[in-house]
């Protein structure tokens, strides 16, 4: 029988999980449209994935920090504090990501070559990556705004906004990739331009919803010492985990890209299929983070135990295993995926062991340490 803790958890988890599922299915439609143009266009679009995720690593870390802080204040009395955290984080994200995006733009071609791009499709990759950088910036700002909604458990609202934005993305991409009527066919550049407009829509829609909920009330956008005192310890720990995992994924993807455009295109399609499960289950991780954060604010050890979630990242192991299977045994793309399977098994084992150690310490004691 489902108890009240389970119902609260599922109310947050299911919309977040289905949002991830809808988003990856729509993204798959996107990849299918690009795929009709050939293997080189798939490789050109996919080679930008890791630079994009490196940029999002910073905004996601900040957004997760915002969610954890806001979830502890997730009631009407805490709305003013949540609003202040959101607005100051928006300023930090706009400035930090703005500088990073400028650096990426200035050295974009070198970055793509570093990621494993070849002269066969570098021009296509540049056509896609320049507008895709703009879309990534809009996504980063949206993540900060939606972090507040997530902190309040409003995953259904996030789902509706993101799915609407991605439907717009699919429609615009179809028009701009293939061309309809007076609109010329733009190929991979059209896919990126469609994403720019879709991400801008999601940003504006999210901001409008939060404004209607009163989160843009009178408070300063300028970060102060108190803000940094709250945010930096959380941001630093999350960024270290996110950054370590991203470094491992960059090396992993670079090895796959080094196999050539066609194997890399196949690898990218397979990764997209795997992301169907990954994006779905991530919704449950978000719900665990939110309910655990809310329970910390209430001092409820039991709720934290029900909502406990851990993500233990193994950074060095995957590239080492990938290099061994790829170069040592000469297994090619099969070796890349064998390394991925082993890595995920080890990560799951480590995460379970880590959670058992936390449980042995006692949740109430952990909450007291956090306080």
Regions inferred by a protein language model and the residue ranges of each:
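Helix-loop-helix hairpin linking two adjacent transmembrane segments in secondary transporters
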Residues: 135-138, 146, 150, 155-203
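Hydrophobic transmembrane alpha-helices of multi-pass small-molecule transporters
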Residues: 54-57, 169-173, 203-207, 276-279, ...
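Small-residue-rich hydrophobic transmembrane alpha-helices
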Residues: 42-102, 139-158, 257, 266-310
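Transmembrane alpha-helix boundary and packing residues in multipass membrane permease domains
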Residues: 16, 20, 31-32, 49, ...
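Transmembrane alpha-helical core residues of multi-pass small-molecule transporters
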Residues: 49-52, 96, 161-169, 194-202, ...
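Transmembrane helical elements of multi-pass membrane transporters/channels
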Residues: 11-30, 131, 135, 165, ...
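Short alpha-helical transmembrane segments in multi-pass integral membrane proteins
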Residues: 1-16, 70-137, 183-239, 292-300, ...
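Helix-terminus/linker motif at the lipid-water interface of multi-pass membrane proteins
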Residues: 25-43, 112-119, 175-186, 243-276, ...
């Amino acid at each position: 029988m489902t108890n009240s803790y389970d119902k609260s958890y599922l109310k947050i988890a299911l919309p977040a999980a289905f949002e991830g599922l809808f988003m990856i299915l729509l993204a798959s439609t996107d990849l299918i449209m690009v795929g009709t143009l050939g293997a080189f266009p798939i490789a050109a679009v996919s080679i930008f994935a890791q630079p994009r995720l490196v940029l999002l690593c910073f905004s996601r870390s900040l957004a997760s920090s915002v969610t954890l802080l806001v979830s502890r204040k997730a009631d009407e009395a805490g709305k003013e504090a949540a609003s202040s955290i959101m607005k100051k984080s928006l300023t930090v994200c706009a400035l930090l990501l703005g500088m990073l995006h400028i650096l990426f733009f200035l050295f974009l071609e070198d970055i793509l070559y570093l990621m494993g791009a070849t002269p066969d499709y570098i021009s296509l990759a540049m056509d896609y990556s320049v507008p895709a950088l703009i879309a990534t910036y809009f996504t980063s700002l949206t993540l900060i705004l939606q972090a507040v909604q997530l902190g309040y458990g409003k995953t259904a609202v996030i789902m509706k906004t993101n799915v609407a934005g991605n439907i717009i993305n699919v429609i615009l991409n179809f028009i701009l990739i293939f061309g309809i009527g007076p609109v010329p066919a733009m190929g991979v550049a059209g896919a990126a331009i469609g994403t720019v407009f879709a991400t801008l829509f999601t940003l504006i829609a999210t901001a409008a919803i939060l404004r209607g909920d009163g989160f843009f009330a009178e408070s300063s956008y300028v970060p102060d010492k108190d803000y940094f005192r709250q945010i930096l310890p959380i941001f630093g720990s999350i960024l270290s985990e996110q950054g370590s995992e991203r470094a491992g994924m960059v090396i992993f993807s670079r090895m796959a890209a080094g196999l050539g455009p066609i194997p890399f295109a196949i690898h990218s399609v397979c990764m997209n299929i795997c992301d169907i499960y990954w994006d779905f289950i991530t919704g449950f991780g978000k719900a665990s983070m939110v309910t655990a954060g809310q329970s910390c604010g209430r001092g409820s050890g039991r709720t934290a135990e029900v909502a406990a979630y851990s993500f233990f990242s193994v950074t060095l192991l995957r590239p080492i295993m990938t290099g061994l299977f790829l170069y040592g045994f000469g297994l090619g793309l099969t070796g890349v995926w064998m390394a991925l399977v082993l890595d995920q098994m080890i990560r799951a084992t480590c995460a379970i062991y880590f959670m058992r150690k936390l449980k042995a310490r006692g949740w109430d004691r952990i909450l007291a340490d956090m306080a």
